Amino acid sequence: MIRRRTLLSLVPAVSMAPFAARAQTMEVRFGTSTAGGGFAPYAAALIDALKSVDPILDIKPVITKGATDNAERLQKGDIDIGLVSGEVMYEWLSEHPDKPKLRVISVIYSTPGMFAVRPDTRYHRIRDLLGRSIVWNPRGTGSAVQARYVMQGLGLDMDRDFDPIYPESFADGPTMVIERRAAALWGSGYRWPGFVELTNQPAGARFIVPTRAEITQIRAKFPFLAELTVPGGMYPGQYEPLTTVGAWSYILARPDLDDGIGYRLARSLFRAERSSMPSKHTVQTTARNTLAAVGSLDALQPGVLRFYREAKLVQ
């Protein structure tokens, strides 16, 4: 018996994460989004990544209206975890300071925001789009909320200074630009589906981002928006890097999520991160990025923080 204890004591603590939890199926309700935005392909890739390292972790996707809907459902306890953009998270915490806080499981990816227009138009700057019909995407989605903050940072109102379009589906936006029913489409993220569709058209697309002075102006009003760069070659015909603003998006947990679930999710995400073939959709979903993005360790779900400490990722 003494010898057995000695051998067990040599096994790293992180690999001894609750054996009972590993041996049991655990159901997690996961708020995603409607098709056509960046969350939908990410959610599918995340579920596949988690299944590859923890096959009996039963992630149940729940199709929602997007980031704001996910925040509302998390607060009510209707879902266990959900995808929420950084802009919606900032807004939710600001508007509901007295409610139990939604906690961070992990970052998803950073979301640089910009416009796409047909290349045969005369629009080259944001101010050129004033009064024009703009597809802001479905109301309450991370992209639409981000656009509102960016426009407010420039002293503009997305509803009064533009002719706003809020389609029911993300998929409607590119078609409206292609058919000239809209002058521009706002989107956020790398390889954002709407932009991929536009740039794959024979005519292609041209992107419009804030100028250097406009980026400074936006960040002066909303410091939580970071300066982000879309590398050249991300889309067909886009050869130069594009610098704009955006924020990290998150996997958030309901306030009373069991710490054992948080721990298991963090452990599985860490294993997926260290796998030899991470998905292109989840490559930014790392513990390092999560720790860099959160303002305080208190923002982390307690089970996640416990795993990070056992894995020696934080003190």
Spans of features found by a protein language model:
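C-terminal segment of N-terminal export signals and the immediately downstream linker at the start
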Residues: 1, 19-28
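Bilobed "Venus flytrap"/periplasmic-binding protein-like clamshell domains
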Residues: 27-53, 57, 111-179, 280, ...
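Short beta-strand-centered segments that line the small-molecule binding cleft or hinge
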Residues: 101-109
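Ligand-binding clefts/hinges and TM-proximal coupling segments of bilobed small-molecule sensing domains
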Residues: 139-150, 225-293
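Pocket-lining segment of extracytoplasmic ligand-binding domains
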Residues: 86-88, 97, 121, 158-257
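An extracytoplasmic/periplasmic, membrane-proximal ligand-sensing/linker region
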Residues: 171-172, 178-180, 189-207, 217-219, ...
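N-terminal export signals
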Residues: 6-23
